[in-house]
A protein has these predicted regions:
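Conserved PLP-anchoring active-site segment centered on the Schiff-base-forming lysine
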Residues: 35-81
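Conserved PLP-binding active-site segment in aminotransferase class I/II-type PLP enzymes
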Residues: 1-41, 82-84
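Hydrophobic anchor at the start of a short beta-strand
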Residues: 22, 65, 110-112
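A short beta-strand submotif of the Rossmann-like class I SAM-dependent methyltransferase core
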Residues: 24, 46, 90
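Active-site phosphate-binding strand-loop segment of PLP-dependent enzymes
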Residues: 71-113
Length: 113
């Protein structure tokens, strides 16, 4: 099966960048790899409903992963107690799950990707 990529055309706007000191990366996969390397995570919890290419950065960085199930509302079915070298990856499917993202951020803090 061919993956549908997360690359969108470059939008140029007038004025300065919103975050002038930001690091600019070209794909979600590259952003994920950067986070894995920068934070030094050893294990990531990742939803089963995830594009196969998101496993590439995990393999490349030697990071272990464990899949978790989501319910019919695209929310995790289980909560984890994370070690300091672990992270929880959540996909905000179609940008509709802001309340869920907020709950997960309150639970996992900076360990939420």
């Amino acid at each position: 099966m061919k993956e549908i990529g997360g690359y969108f055309e470059l939008e140029l706007h007038k004025g300065g960048h919103y975050h002038p000191d930001a690091l600019y990366l070209n794909t979600g996969r590259n952003c994920f790899e950067y986070i894995l390397r920068a934070k030094g995570y050893k294990k990531v919890y990742i939803p089963y409903y995830t594009c196969e290419v998101m496993l590439e950065p995990l393999r490349k960085c030697g990071v272990k992963w464990e899949f978790y199930h989501i319910n019919e509302d695209f929310e995790p079915l289980i909560s984890y107690s994370l070690a300091t070298d672990e992270a929880f990856l959540y996909t905000n499917y179609w940008g509709l799950k802001q309340a869920c993202v907020k709950r997960l951020a309150e639970r996992y803090g900076k360990q939420l990707i």
